[in-house]
Amino acid sequence: MSSSIFGPLTGFLERVNSLNAPYQALSYDEQKAMTIWQRVKFYNWTFELCALGVLFLVYAFYKFGNSVNLKRGNQIFQSLHSFLANDLKFSRVGFNINDSKIFTVEHQNTWFSSFATGRSAIKSINLNLHLVARSNPFSMCLEYLLGFFFASLKSKQLEEFMEIVIRPNGILVTSESAHPNKNAHEILTKFRFVTSIVNKEFMNQARTENYFLSIAHTSENDKLPNNFVYMSDVNQLSGFMFHYSKPYEVLSQAGNLLKYISFTDLPVNPPRDDKEWESSIEPKAIIRCAVPQNENELKLLNQIISLVVEIYDGFTQDLVQQSPNLFITNDILKRTTNLRQQELNKIKKFMKETELELAKEKKLELEKAKRRQLKASGQQEKVDQKMKEKRERRLKNKQRTRFQ
């Protein structure tokens, strides 16, 4: 077995050494008599040149992969920033535009991030782009092969996606001279629900990866294109998006791009305790989609973002102005609140069970430690004898009581 593994390697090393067999055959005096230029000409540099060639290829792949990711990131964020600033009228978009740092780049040009803020009804928009690390094609190919043959070993770093998180602020400003409403906190309490439009192909993965979708109910409707379904914690919420916008045309074109749009106040990861539950409750809309590949898909992504902003505009306006056409009724909010309380009770129950298990384990460890100490001091036999006598007395008392 070892010869079959190391045999080719040994043969390769021998061939490398044989490249300079004539030079190594020279005696010390012969090498000493040669000038530096003569040694350079006589020496076989094949192996060194091949090594330099490999290093150059690695560096070239690294630079090329990084440049490809950076070019795609620039193209996507320039389109998004222009749309957010000019069409949706956000007052601040991106980072330092003067230094051309309109987005941040991390992890060898694989994670791109930016934001927008300063607008009525919207607190902020976070833009996140993840691309495959093209700087190391050998590692990328190996991970693809492992993921293809062993699904459990598939790396999440191989998935390319775009995620946009839009957070409302509960503030309505209809004009530059208008005063904002002062009950923003109260308005935001009306955003506590989950309603989503999810691509059927991504539905199972979405449930697995997102806690807020794992507790949602699935339903279909003629208003949706065939490749999308509703996922909401209350069935009446399915019409929420259509009440404040007309998304059918955009959705019918976004079958290959959009994975889901979700309005939620619940976190992505399941809370482990009640404190984490309370701290993670935050109203937001999450858009998850594939990475746009061309100008048409970039325009489509901009339209999807515009739909969500339009929905938040309309919903916030109805809440602030107490419109009779308000879609989210007190009955719906009561039902969503009850569902959240049920989920919180499950978490608390799990916490108590976990604490009891830990207490039992700790008690068992203490008893074992105590027994080891008694055994080491020679007192264990006396303790066992006392326990035995105690059990016998209890048994006799029970028998005596029974006969009486």
Curated annotation (Swiss-Prot):
UniProt keyword list: Acetylation, Endoplasmic reticulum, Glycoprotein, Membrane, Transmembrane, Transmembrane helix
InterPro entries named in the record: CCDC47 (IPR012879)
GO MF annotations in UniProt: calcium ion binding
GO biological process: endoplasmic reticulum calcium ion homeostasis
Organism domain of life: Eukaryota
Modified residues (N-acetylserine): 2
TM spans (from-to): 49-68
Pfam families linked to this entry: CCDC47
Glycosylated residue positions: 44, 98
Keyword rRNA-binding set for record: no
Gene Ontology CC: endoplasmic reticulum; endoplasmic reticulum membrane
Region (Disordered): 369-404
Membrane disposition: Single-pass membrane protein
Bias (Basic residues): 393-404
Subcellular location: Endoplasmic reticulum membrane
Chief localisation class: endoplasmic reticulum
Bias type Basic and acidic residues, positions: 381-392
Extra remark beyond the main annotation: Present with 34906 molecules/cell in log phase SD medium.
Family that this chain belongs to: Belongs to the UPF0674 family.
Name of the protein described by the UniProt record: UPF0674 endoplasmic reticulum membrane protein YNR021W
Native source species: Saccharomyces cerevisiae (strain ATCC 204508 / S288c)
